[in-house]
Amino acid sequence: VAASGQLKSIAVGLLKIANDLRWLGSGPRAGIGEITLPEVQPGSSIMPGKVNPVIAESVAMVSAQVIGNDTTIAIAGQSGNFELNVMMPVAAHNLLESIDLLSTSAVNFAHQCVNGLEATGKGPEMVMQGLTIGTALAPIIGYDVAAGIVHEASVSGENIREVALRMTDLTEEQLDEILEPLSMTEPKA
């Protein structure tokens, strides 16, 4: 039961990663589109020319099976009477199936999906055009003023930098330093 629980944890983690990659690769003209997934299987049954994220989808299916197997194993584990458990065969079968499915799926996911991921140009553009970058202004100009800038950018369609230039006394150079995304990834003392 414990081993199956660990396999389920791995399945949940792989499912999360696969779904994140599906979302980040959604597009080409609608969706997030920050990454390009390898084209493993051409075409889509609904949209001609679209490439489906079939490897990530296969990981999702395997994860669902492993999670289901864990439920069966948990029921089998609690079904024993004293020293006898007639459900050991189904527990063993599902445990071995989960091991096989996860190991095969993880290797396939790495080789046919993760190793072929490519970043698109959308990511940096989305950061600079996004509203979340406005959080970097709060320690400098105060929460309320920063919130006003974010709101104005949201309403006007301008980016945070343009609105901050107009609504504050900050210079272009100061804003370049404050709104540098990389500086937001490190803790400050």
Question: Residue ranges of each PLM-predicted region?
Answer:
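Acidic, glycine-rich loop-and-beta core segments that form the ion-binding/anion-interacting portion
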Residues: 1-35
